[in-house]
Amino acid sequence: MSNPYGFPQYVIDRVMAKRGRLNVFDRFEPRRTALLVIDMQNFYVGEIASVVGIIPNINRIAADVRAKGGRVIWVGMSAGKGGQSDWPIYHDHFFTPEKGANHRDQLSPGHPGHAFHKGLDVKSGDDIVYKNRFSPFIAGASNIDDVLKQSGIDSLIVTGT
């Protein structure tokens, strides 16, 4: 069987035995699909070549999703504001005091680290969602569930860091 994804053959065999076909869907509905671009903020991306190197592909996928009628949602981390942490147990116990403050402050609105990388093609019609935990899907971490439901989105393409 052709394997353009580089999966080991045993994985393909297990998938085929489970559902009888490799792909879950034969096609997708663009208007019910969103591209989620996760944590492509200056704090995480910086000028790390391997991360900056994926930006052209992210922009290309975003343009294709938009052109077909899908949505693009940029998801970023907001760790606090005004010196106050949105997740104090994380900042106070998983870091040294200095590193916890650095993470909190650089991922606060208004700090250059909080901004999405300048190479990303964020459009005015795109959605921007901020989270205060690792995943935007943790209850109370973001409004991503509302954004997806209000837009009729039930299929996701996920990329980023």
Walk through the language-model features, giving the residues of each.
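Active-site acidic carboxylates
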Residues: 1-124
